[in-house]
From Swiss-Prot:
This is RING finger protein 113B. A zinc finger (C3H1-type) spans 190-218. GO terms for biological process: snoRNA splicing. The keyword Zinc-finger applies. The lineage of its organism: Eukaryota, Metazoa, Chordata, Craniata, Vertebrata. It comes from Homo sapiens (Human). It comes from the Eukaryota. Keywords: Metal-binding, Zinc, Zinc-finger. InterPro entries: CWC24-like (IPR039971), Znf_CCCH (IPR000571), Znf_CCCH_sf (IPR036855), Znf_RING (IPR001841), Znf_RING/FYVE/PHD (IPR013083), Znf_RING_CS (IPR017907). The keyword Zinc-finger applies. GO terms for cellular component: U2-type spliceosomal complex. The gene is RNF113B. GO terms for molecular function: zinc ion binding.
Length: 322
């Protein structure tokens, strides 16, 4: 239901809607610009020339170019100009020698001198030798009053116990000794692995896994030994040498660590180290500690039954092979 019109107003005035006008904000910088006055078509050129001083002329706007493209075009034009300006006489052409030998000395610079060293004519030992020759030539003669340089003054007394007096021996030299100019050596490298000596001889190493040497009981031959066998025709003929050692055999020490001989009545300590009975008792008289790990044994040496059984098994296997 519509509300009744207020008293004192007509129906047409009540239906009218009030509108609000908002002022648009002006552009920044527009306040400092002058407006160009409107010119009449009748005045023509006179009015335009008269108002020329009051108007502000704006330069035409140029679209900016990308910096990379601009620099690339400049560099390309610069290269083209350089190519056009370069004369044809700068072209380098190499003619083939039709030879397989390298260009240069045949010894490939092996007899070349070191350019940073002093020249041999001005080297201190050379000057000393020249001075000695002059002194020997003038010895016993009268002075001829000829100047031969600062190093060739006549000496009436023969120097002794000095670098000049002992220089003939070759052990004492005056000034720095010149290194040999030409030196060529032929070196041959051969591979020889570092094998743990204790493990190879006894089958046990006190360092264990921390040992930096190779734990292997195999026999190694050097390169010259293999070449000699190849020349004599004895290489890989003996089949007994081509065998592999099992992992079970590697854990068995096959020799005493004290005497480095085969076990005689082997005994074992509390720290699980194996020795001959006589070697263990003799060492116990000197010290009650273990020979390998230096732990106290307490005088307890048990018979190594496991070791004896394994050694007998190995001996039986070797007897069958024979």
């Amino acid at each position: 239901m519509a509300a009744p019109p207020s008293p004192g107003r007509t129906a047409d005035q009540a239906d009218q809607v009030c509108t609000f006008l908002f002022k648009k904000p002006g552009r920044k910088g527009a306040a400092g610009l002058r407006k160009r006055p409107a010119c009449d078509p009748e005045h023509g050129e006179s009015s335009s020339s008269g108002d020329e001083g009051d108007t502000v002329a704006q330069p035409p706007r140029v679209a900016p170019r990308p910096r990379g493209l601009h620099s690339w075009q400049k560099a390309a034009h610069g290269d083209r100009r350089g190519e056009e300006a370069a004369p044809e006489s700068l072209d380098v052409v190499y003619r083939s020698t039709r030879s397989a030998k390298p260009v240069g000395p045949e010894d490939m610079g092996a007899t070349a001198d070191f350019e940073q060293d002093t020249e041999k004519e001005h080297h201190t030992p050379t000057i000393l030798k020249c001075s000695q020759r002059v002194q020997e030539a003038l010895r016993g003669r009268e002075h001829d009053h000829i100047y031969r340089g600062i190093h060739s003054y006549l000496r009436y007394l023969k120097p002794k116990d000095t670098s000049m007096g002992n220089s003939s021996s070759g052990m004492a030299r005056k000034g720095p000794i010149r290194a040999p100019g030409h030196l060529r050596a032929t070196v041959r490298w051969d591979y020889q692995p570092d094998i743990c000596k204790d493990y190879k001889e006894t089958g046990f190493c006190g360092f264990g896994d921390s040992c930096k040497f190779l734990h292997d009981r195999s026999d190694y031959k050097l390169g010259w030994e293999i070449e000699r066998e190849l020349e004599e025709g004895r290489y890989c003929i003996c089949e007994d040498e081509n065998h592999e050692v099992g992992s079970e055999e590697e854990e068995i020490p096959f020799r005493c660590f004290i005497c480095r001989q085969a076990f005689q009545n082997p005994v074992v300590t509390k720290c699980r180290h194996y020795f001959c009975e006589s070697c263990a008792l003799e060492h116990f008289r000197a010290t009650p500690r273990c020979y390998i790990c230096d732990q106290p044994t307490g005088g307890i040496f048990n018979p190594a039954k496991e070791l004896m059984a394994k050694l007998q098994k190995l001996q039986a296997a070797e007897g069958k092979k024979r």
